[in-house]
Swiss-Prot record, chains A, B, C, D:
Homotetramer. This is Chorismate synthase. PROSITE patterns: CHORISMATE_SYNTHASE_1, CHORISMATE_SYNTHASE_2, CHORISMATE_SYNTHASE_3. NADP(+) binds at residues 39, 45. One of its GO terms (molecular function) is chorismate synthase activity. The keyword Cytoplasm does not apply. It comes from Thermotoga sp. (strain RQ2). HAMAP family: Chorismate_synth (MF_00300). The gene is aroC. SUPFAM superfamilies: Chorismate synthase, AroC. One of its GO terms (biological process) is chorismate biosynthetic process. Its EC number is 4.2.3.5. Pathway: Metabolic intermediate biosynthesis; chorismate biosynthesis; chorismate from D-erythrose 4-phosphate and phosphoenolpyruvate: step 7/7. Keywords: Amino-acid biosynthesis, Aromatic amino acid biosynthesis, FAD, Flavoprotein, FMN, Lyase, NADP. Belongs to the chorismate synthase family.
Length: 376, 376, 376, 376
């Protein structure tokens, strides 16, 4: 599977193309609508958001609601037209402005924001949401939520997946801990008042991923590598930890095996469901560090690149934090990565064939006869 | 540039192939020798290490010490022959054993360790060390060191690069803080006694990387994405944070601009030298979370996959920690990533041409005439 | 550079995404308009063509007519709406119908034509035409024309490029030999009457390509491999020969060197401008074998896949031949391949930098000082 | 699956790395030995050949004769040591000499031949031969032979595959037509006397390839595109035609369907077994144009790049023709392409799982229930 994302934040469309989707898959557009809505509607988002309805259109690869095996293209129209703006020459710390100017050398910083703003994550969100229709066929569920905002950390995170989802959905900041939610809302209010912006952390979990997904052949097909590759493409993401961040002592960290009704279980899941680049049947979970938005409400020190004189960053209306929407985007990203690795494992063709392949291949027993001709 | 790594830990060779290296580059084999030696010689490494001399041979792409533009192949012989071993059927928590058995279904866990052991990082180390001969031509320097081992954290890290390197090299665990080094050695001794293993953290810095390296075109050519992709392929790596982990408030985190002698400077470098996927001229720095080695000195709970009865993991002689060598490997990984992005920026051909291209393209001034035909 | 093409022939848009285009390039939309018109307007095209105006829109990566370095997306709307059609279960020989049904297993052959019809080549044509704005900056010109249709072969092909273009453009079938053009028109008329379809051959030339483009590092970066990879993705293409098809004797075939005013010249160009995967400074030229359209005007023998009874292929209004439009498509394909290889050579960033790099690197002299430190 | 090939013709080894091979596959080294022998031993090969024994070693990814899922590395030692040679500054027409000098700018043409000589095809031959152990599991057989040498064309080519193989193997030039073989041997003798070299044509057939292999999703996953990509990477290959070269009239060319015992058959196979980028169940067959060797026995006109004076190409002992060994190399290339596409279709893991997947998925019937929820 290959995902291509294009689009400028004030262009006509954001575009996602998914190649390698099996044929015969029924796409539930409601999921896409819901995830785009979630990405847009959370506490702390600014005015631009409400100008965009995040309608979307699937313009290829789907016929009567069913995939055809051809590339699937999703277009998300940008509602906010491109206002005539003055040339901007004062770069904002934390944004691509300066770095892109040095590389691309076009003398208007407005240009670079078109590609590098978080607007393109709407296309990633749509692509991930579309792939949930695929994951559902294999009983794989993906869920993302906020675990930290500014200095407020979530403490009580339900273990039960449905409760976790419900509590998250009840939170204006997608944090399943109601008490922390209140603290986070206060953080947002205070930051807004100060003109400050907030970073934080997000956790994403994939439940139901079978053991054996990923690879140790090509280094870049290791599931960890795929996670690193896509998550670090998300603008606000500056850090990714797979599984527990507390990894100081082997005895505390390594997930021992036990048997439960004759089946293998783990007591803990510090490793995040991946061992050696391949899933081990436990939840795949990822912690993501999300940086504060670079567009602050009070000016920061900068330099006017035109005059090479000190200058202050301009005041631009913006969100206070990208952490809650980042939880939606990261959920989508994990859906993309798991789908990609799952399809690499199962091959291509018709979804019913892939499901049959999947169904026929339960966990191996030691004496299954594999490698039968091998003589040591 | 493309890096391919192959080799089994008890096979004849570990193999690294680098495609896309410019012609005419003088390779300093001494660097490779030194880095392989560093990877092998640090406190806490077990006996296997001393059995390997990490000789290496460059068998293609270099003629008389100069690259030819053809793929460069490095072979690192494995000295430790493959001992006859019994079939192993008890998976070790934290290792690929169980996950790979489910995927590949060959009934001997010894098989999977061949590819998934950290032994292949010797090839990555060699490849990164070779690329230092490239980076040197552009005055780019890469340095990695240990910042945490078990519960001991480094506090005093010199800002001066040469002092940093010197202090790191004086430390048996590659930690530039002498006091922390002592603590870390104690941690290792204690862990060894207990049969425990240690995780920790590593920091890698690339100094001298020019602004403008990376891209915002293809998502996966963003420098962050490249870092995520390669670092997460390293067996022991479970987490990567680019720049500071303290990213909770915009005012504290965003690196403001200032002018110094008419040149743009930053007061801080929390962003780790990358904005929007492109370097901004500051040091690129990365924190890496390294998990404890899964082969503990005391048995862990497991299951015998042959009998499906509870079992204990076998005692295998092993290192206590992979953190110090991981600092060498991560240094190599950053050298690979920076080289790759630099070559994408500069194109291919002869190194002298690339250097001329590089030299001719200083930072743009606003009125440089780029985009001159554009009429707003 | 990476080209992604999506779109169903009756969907809303055909989509081309180009990643890795340098910033600051002025796009001449007139070229795109012209090439789309040419693809559509030639003798022998059927009715569907006139229903499509091949309007197009560049919806990303271009700001005020100038590229920004972000992915460039071109949308070409499909004018012909999707008529309600009966399920089709009789596969046409030569079309994807049967092969795709076996793979994707959706019981309506209409589905597969959506992706596999030649309609997607409109997106390739647009992408190639857009890249002509890039090639123009480097004085590279690409030209395609018909050399054979049915049994009629072109004999008199002008050597002068401008004359060649003019004569081609005067021909209703894009054949620069006026006499052959007449014969080809007769072939088309006769075939139409008989319900037959016509194959043929196309020649594409890239003039002005500097020596040194391509690579011998990665096998798949050899220019020949890139040509094979893209040309064979074009639906009607079944054969590709680089340079002369008459390659039986070394003495006749190999292009000897001579000096003209102190510069190296070749007497002949049988090798098609590529030696060892790298351009040699002569014209790059490619012969393409184009198969007859699988939708014939008289029924062919087939099988109804629903009943597994013998059946005849349905009558569907169609073109008689794809050879003239294929000459437009192949011209675009060569523009894509040359652009891709040129950008790999020159790197990325701003077009003016790339032009300076290009300008600074004339042909090497033997004593240029490259490899100066090498001591044999 | 990904194939990487490295190695210099006078370096220690030629290297092939295959990533993505399933685990549990028994490798028959005898096939590799046989194909390397065939590549080396045919009429018209020069002296260098006999100096090489083409021993080979599989140094990774295989354990006790069985693949492990890890990358498979094959090393083929180069027996001919690197003789001390004078600097060479006179480029040979048809070889990479001049083009590579312009690109890489190293002042010794001997350098470029290291990578660009046909010597690396020994690694491709070994890789393809190894993959025959995979194809055999799916009853797929690949066969290549010479159809033209100089002006002599094969006429009588047996349709029966075993007879075809036998006759080919009896021919000193791998041409299954005994009469043509004689003519070809005369061509070689005459060419040798004249110092001339010979081009020709090769045909490669894959029998037993199931319908449904390939894809119409990503353009570059079409089977035709994969064939073009790999075949045009082979040094001597200048042309590739899939199926019949006679493609002028639809009625003559398109392969009509018929029923035989209730199964779908074709009367002809002009399309070469691929429709729309996907196999249709017929033999996949490819014609390959092979150029004459650029090292002629009598000097050609050239230029001394050092002095920029006219010069003659040096006399170097060489083969008269690469066509017979090219038939071996192209057979290997088709084995690689078909394996790659087959594995993309079937996914990864253990070979026995892949065989079960394969076995469970016979040709679909129209009413198989795929796409069952679709409501037009």
């Amino acid at each position: 599977m290959r995902l291509t994302i294009a689009g400028d934040s004030h262009g006509k469309y954001m575009i996602a193309v998914l190649e390698g989707i099996p044929a015969g898959l029924k796409i539930d557009e409601e999921i896409i609508r819901r995830e785009l809505f979630r990405r847009r509607n959370c506490y702390g988002r600014g005015k631009r958001m409400s100008m965009e309805e995040d309608a979307f259109e699937i313009v290829s690869g789907v016929w009567g609601g069913i995939t055809t095996g051809a590339p699937v293209t999703i277009l998300v129209p940008n509602k906010a037209g491109n206002p005539v703006k003055d040339v901007r020459s004062v770069p904002r710390p934390g944004h691509i402005d300066y770095a892109a100017f040095v590389k691309y050398k076009l003398p208007d910083l407005n240009v670079y924001v078109e590609r590098s703003s978080a607007r393109w994550t709407v296309a990633l969100t749509a692509a991930g949401a579309l792939l949930k229709s695929l994951l559902r066929e294999f009983n794989i569920d993906v869920l993302g939520f906020v675990t930290r905002l500014g200095n407020v950390e979530a403490k009580n995170i339900p273990d039960n997946f449905e409760e976790l989802r419900r509590k998250r959905d009840e939170s204006a900041v997608f944090c399943p801990d109601p008490e922390a939610t209140e603290g986070m809302i206060s953080e947002i209010d205070r930051a807004k008042e100060e003109g400050n912006t907030l970073g934080g952390k997000v956790k994403v979990i994939a439940r139901g991923v079978p053991a054996g997904i990923g690879s140790y052949s090509d280094l870049f097909k290791k599931l960890d590598s795929k996670i690193g590759s896509l998550f670090f493409a998300i603008p606000a993401v500056k850090g990714v930890v797979i599984g527990s961040e507390e990894m100081w002592y082997g005895f505390d960290y390594l997930d021992e095996f036990e048997l439960e009704d004759g089946r293998i279980k783990r007591r803990t899941n510090n490793l995040g469901g991946i061992e050696g680049g391949i899933t081990n049947g436990e939840d795949v979970w990822v912690n993501v560090f999300v940086k504060p938005i670079p567009t602050t409400g009070k000016p920061l020190n900068s330099v006017d690149l035109r005059t090479m004189e000190p200058a202050k960053t301009p005041y631009v209306r913006s969100d206070v934090t990208a952490v809650p929407p980042a939880s939606v985007v990261c959920e989508a990203a994990l859906a993309v990565v798991i789908s990609d690795a799952l399809l690499e494992h199962l091959g291509d063709g018709n979804i019913d064939d892939l499901k049959r392949r999947f169904g026929n291949e339960n966990l191996p027993r030691w004496d299954d006869g594999f490698w039968k001709e091998y003589d040591r």
